[in-house]
Design a protein with these regions (language model features):
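Soluble extramembrane regions of membrane proteins in the secretory/endomembrane system
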Residues: 1-194
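Core alpha-helical transmembrane segments of integral membrane proteins
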Residues: 192-255
């Protein structure tokens, strides 16, 4: 979503808070299980996800009702949203994935990407299982119970931050988390991923679009019209060429 707010992740979840409210309260979308609404985000989107868990956690305690956000998965973000004062409001299942070689890990409390001893990750796990004595996290191990809405897992893949949405292991961890928390039949295993073919053919389309710029421009100018339509066609030609050069194909990773 777009917002003029500089705190859009915290105050709006980039639009996710309103979307969850709509899904939960409307009768228009009857194919969504209102008791199994989840949220996933990477990087700044990860901040929005954990802020959502906190926002709806506060709301559920205030109204004495079940949290509307059943489960959240946070990818590539711990430097914000994981302080004790924030985490104490969470009462959703939480999955955390942080790249061991994240180039932004210098911003974390210990200046590295090791989640087994990261204070931010420890704050999460300690709160979820109500055990302040935990001093080291078992990576890829589940803590808490699904029925208590405090199931928690921390992943620490040996990759870079921007590669998390583009590699099989991080994607598998995300899928497995929601399969587990939503009790979904695992007839299709999380390793059976096909999204990478979309990215591959998007790359092919990008290369082809650049290769076509010169021959396409030559074709447009080869049979140039005369008369009053000449200026109009010329402007359209320039517009099309600029669009090819500036934009090319646009792709959004599946996450």
């Amino acid at each position: 979503s777009s917002s003029f707010s500089r705190r859009a992740a915290t105050t709006e979840g980039y639009g996710m808070f309103a979307l969850v409210e709509y899904l939960y309260n409307t009768s228009n979308i009857n194919y969504v299980d209102k008791n199994l609404i989840g949220s996933f985000g990477h990087s700044a989107g990860g901040l929005a996800a954990i802020r959502g868990a906190q926002y709806f956690g506060k709301q559920s305690k205030k109204l004495s009702e079940e949290n509307k956000l059943h489960s959240v998965f946070v990818s590539g973000m711990v430097r914000m949203g994981f302080k004790e004062k924030d985490i104490k409001h969470v009462d959703s299942n939480v999955g955390l994935s942080y790249a061991l070689y994240d180039e932004g890990s210098w911003q974390n409390e210990l200046k590295n990407g090791d989640m087994s001893i990261a204070p931010e990750a420890l704050n999460l796990v300690r709160h979820q299982v109500s055990d302040p004595s935990i001093s080291k996290i078992g990576i890829d191990s589940f803590y808490g119970k699904l029925n208590d809405r405090n199931l928690t897992v921390v992943h620490n893949e040996k990759v870079l931050h921007p590669m998390q949405p583009y590699l099989f292991e991080p994607m598998k961890n995300q899928i497995d988390f929601f399969l587990k928390t939503f009790n979904i039949d695992r007839s299709i295993v999380a390793t059976n991923q096909v999204w990478h073919w979309k990215e591959f053919f998007t790359l092919v389309a990008l290369v082809c679009s650049f290769l076509l710029i010169v021959p396409f421009a030559k074709f447009l100018f080869s049979k140039y019209p005369s008369g009053p339509f000449q200026i109009i066609v010329f402007n359209l030609d320039i517009l099309l060429i600029n669009k090819l050069i500036v934009l090319g194909p646009i792709s959004n990773p599946i996450s």
